[in-house]
Amino acid sequence: VLARRTDVAKQEDVEALAKAAYERFGAVHILCNNAGIGGSPGASWELSLDDWRWVIDVDLWSVIHGVRSFVPRMIASGEESHVVNTASVAGLVSGAVGGPYTVAKFGVVALSEQLYFELGRAGHPIGVSVLCPGFVNTNIFDSGRNRQTDYGDSDIGATPEGEQRRAALNAMRSTMIQPAEIGELVFEAIRTRSLYIIPTGSEAIENAVRARLENVVERKNPGLDFSIL
C-alpha cells in the first residue's frame, strides 16, 4: 500500500503520485479518478469565480491530470488495464444540482467518451468506464471543510437557502446508494469493459436521462420540474 497526500487540482501533485506509484509497484492496472467535491450552493450567477474554479479544478481538472499522468505510462507498459472516471448523473442531466458541479461532471463524461474512442481506435488494451450514480452516502456534502486556501472562502453556504439545502441532503442519507454497492458495480464494469456505469433500479434517473436525449433529438425544451430521486 502506498498512501500519498495529493492535491488533485495540481498537475505537479498528480504527476508526483504517478511517479511514486510506478516506482513502488512497477505498473498501474486500474486507475480510479474519484476525487470530487459538491461545491457551494447557489445560483450560477451568485457564485464567485473562486467557487467555480474550486469545483472545476477538483472535479474536472483532477481527472484530466490523472489521464495525462497515468495513461501514457499505462500505454507504455502494454499491459491490459482500465481507467475509471467518477462523474455523476449530473453529468448526464442538467438542472438537478449546482452549476459548477454539473458543468464539471458533463466534462468528465465527455472526456471519458473521448478517451474510450482514442484508446480503442489506437488499439491500446486499456478500457474506460465513467461512473454516473445518483446520490451516494458519502461526505461530499461536507466538502467545504477541505476547500484549499487558493480558493478563498465562500459565504453562500451560510445563507438560509444554503443551510436548507444541506439539511435536506443530509435527511436523504438513509435512501442513498451505499458506497459498497457502487464498488461492486465498478468492479463488474471493469470485468466487462463497460463504458457507462449507471446503477440500475432507479426509474427516475433512467427516465430523466431518456427524456433529455429525446428532447435533444426532437429539439424540445425540457420541463422545469423533474426529479432524479
What does each model-identified segment do?
Residues R5-A16, L49:
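The beta1-alpha1 cofactor-binding region of Rossmann-like NAD(H)/NADP(H)-dependent oxidoreductases
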Residues A20-N33, S40:
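A glycine-rich helix->loop->beta "capping" turn
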Residues G42-S44, D51-R53:
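Substrate-binding pocket helix/loop in short-chain dehydrogenase/reductase
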Residues S44, V93-P100:
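Active-site loop immediately N-terminal to the catalytic Tyr-X3-Lys motif
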Residues V67, A104:
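Active-site helix of classical SDR
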Residues S88:
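Residue(s) in the substrate-gating loop at a strand-loop-helix junction
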Residues R121-I197:
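SDR active-site lid
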